[in-house]
């Protein structure tokens, strides 16, 4: 079943009006007709099962059949801080991170980042990454569309992470799987967790020291060296499994929204 997102202001009682590119996609690409069914999420934790009523000018009119609290969000907010990779790797990282439950994605320039983006290029990249995040959220039936932040410096990213409950830094020189297991096991539902991933070439040692001074916890992901596009997704997968296994009902927690 097709899944779309609508701003809460588009929800009016038993009716939802979609606008923008989604209308063209529904009407001209999917060729959805009155009576066909779709899921709509408001980005704030509510899902709506709807029936297409028809199209009016530049809007798709949907009738709400039932609504329920989204059950697809993790019980903790996972924020992926991704060192800028080369080429189009960031697009793939954004897509998969959203599928794995990332709440927000923060790209940053590290000392070993090869890619250098000026303000104009960074803005265009972010728009592209945000569009990919929206598509991935629709495909994976997320209750929110994770935000992709503006590109930051490493220092700005560390300052941003100061408000989080836990900050993890997978590092190839870190040892001790038992220590990593102990750190992961202590993460509680409702906590916010940052994951810092270096670019190709990893982190500079000075960045690791800076992260530790700020309270970040270096962890290991095993004996193998992972690519930058693999390390973050591996960490997200581990955390997703840990949180899902805790079997804590998401409805018992305050619903996170990306408006905060």
Segments predicted by a language model, with ranges:
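N-terminal positively charged helical leader segments and presequences
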Residues: 1-69
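Active-site/ligand-binding-proximal alpha/beta "capping" segment
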Residues: 169-197, 201-202, 217-219
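C-terminal helical cap(s) of enzyme catalytic domains, especially alpha/beta-barrels
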Residues: 232-236, 240
């Amino acid at each position: 079943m097709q899944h779309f997102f609508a701003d809460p202001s588009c929800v009016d009682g038993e009716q939802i009006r979609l606008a923008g590119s989604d209308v063209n996609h529904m009407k001209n690409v999917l060729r959805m007709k009155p009576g066909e069914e779709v899921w709509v999420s408001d980005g704030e934790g509510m899902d709506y099962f709807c029936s297409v009523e028809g199209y009016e000018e530049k809007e798709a009119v949907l009738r709400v059949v039932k609504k329920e609290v989204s059950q697809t969000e993790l019980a903790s907010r996972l924020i992926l801080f991704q060192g800028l990779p080369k080429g189009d790797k960031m697009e793939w990282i954004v897509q998969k991170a959203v599928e794995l439950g990332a709440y927000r994605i923060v790209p940053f320039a590290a000392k070993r980042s090869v890619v250098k983006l000026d303000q104009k290029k960074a803005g265009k990249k972010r728009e592209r990454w945000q569009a990919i995040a929206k598509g991935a959220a629709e495909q994976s039936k997320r209750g929110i569309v994770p935000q992709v932040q503006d590109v930051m410096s490493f220092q700005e990213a560390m300052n941003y992470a100061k408000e989080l409950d836990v900050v993890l830094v997978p590092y190839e020189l870190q040892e001790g799987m038992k220590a990593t297991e102990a750190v992961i096991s202590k993460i509680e539902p409702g906590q916010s967790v940052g994951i810092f991933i270096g670019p190709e070439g990893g982190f500079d040692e000075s960045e690791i020291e800076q992260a530790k001074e700020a309270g970040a916890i270096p962890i290991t992901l095993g004996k193998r060296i992972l690519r930058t596009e693999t390390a973050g997704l591996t960490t997200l997968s581990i955390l997703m499994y840990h949180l899902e296994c805790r079997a804590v009902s998401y409805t018992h927690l305050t619903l996170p929204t990306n408006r905060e």
